[in-house]
Amino acid sequence: MFWFKNVMIYRLTSPLSLESSSLEEQLQQAKFTPCSQSDMSKFGWSSPLSGSELLHFSQGKQFLLVSHKEDKLLPANVIKKETEERIAVLEEKEARKLKKTEKQAIKDDVVAMLLPRAFSKHQFTAIWLDLDAQLVYVDAGSSKRAEDTLALLRKTLGSLPVVPISFALLPSEVMTNWIAKGHTPNWLNLLEEAELKSFDTDSVIRCKRQDLESEEIAQHLQAGKFVTKLAIDWENHFSCVLNEDATLSRVKFADEVREKNDDILKEDIAQRFDADFLLMTEELKLFTQKMIEEFGGIKERI
């Protein structure tokens, strides 16, 4: 199961409805295929469930997809060295300087020669569509990685009107008040890690193994710094770092959560996957609702 390690939440700005069989047909049109000897990169959909031919997993109005990107690794310095050597040999042989187009052609030949021997890097990105709430969750640690997968889904479906979720209150201000005014929600425990930032001077302080209720931290907040990253623990659920843009990083589900379905035999992969997906999505739905409450509700963009 793809237990999310990072969470970026997007809101659908127009209602989206999906039907399993038609979605599968669309996904199959963009199915991942490995790089051939002449490909630098390939991007498409892979099956979320090991051993299944289906390119999506669904429970009611909940859909899980997994994008698969393969990139051939060709070190730029290797290409540069080989290209320069070939150019030097040819220029000496012909007693003239090569044109820009000729140099590019040589570089292209070098890349074509090296590609079949290049190693591949594979990247899998899970995306969960909660169509009950009209929200999209992406397991990505960067906006670019999330946007790449959303762009693939947009191309697959023909349309995908989404924006990053935003709230009436700024998360950085709310997190700052949790520490400065002792307004931490009773369901949440602060861990000893945070990032404080001054928006006036761009100065940044990163704290680890630091009591966030100490006088030292209080002085930084009084001086006008805001909390932009905060390590938190939702007891018996999961821990994570909550960021100023309401994204979550380093999500780690509690053992109590991950062990709930241990009564299902490991051999029954499909049943365990189904149960774990339900478990994870319910946890993230609950946390999203708590964020909505703490941050004053979802902000509707014009």
Curated annotation (Swiss-Prot):
Organism of provenance: Actinobacillus pleuropneumoniae serotype 3 (strain JL03)
Domain of life: Bacteria
Signal sequence segment: none
Keywords: Cytoplasm, DNA recombination
GO biological process: DNA recombination; regulation of DNA recombination
Family per record: Belongs to the RdgC family.
Stated name of the protein: Recombination-associated protein RdgC
Compartments, record wording: Cytoplasm, Nucleoid
Entries under PANTHER family matching the protein: RECOMBINATION-ASSOCIATED PROTEIN RDGC
Pfam families associated with the record: RdgC
Any one Gene Ontology cellular component term annotated for this protein: bacterial nucleoid
GO molecular function, one term: double-stranded DNA binding
InterPro entries named in the record: RdgC
Record's keyword annotation contains Lipid biosynthesis: no
Chain's role: May be involved in recombination.
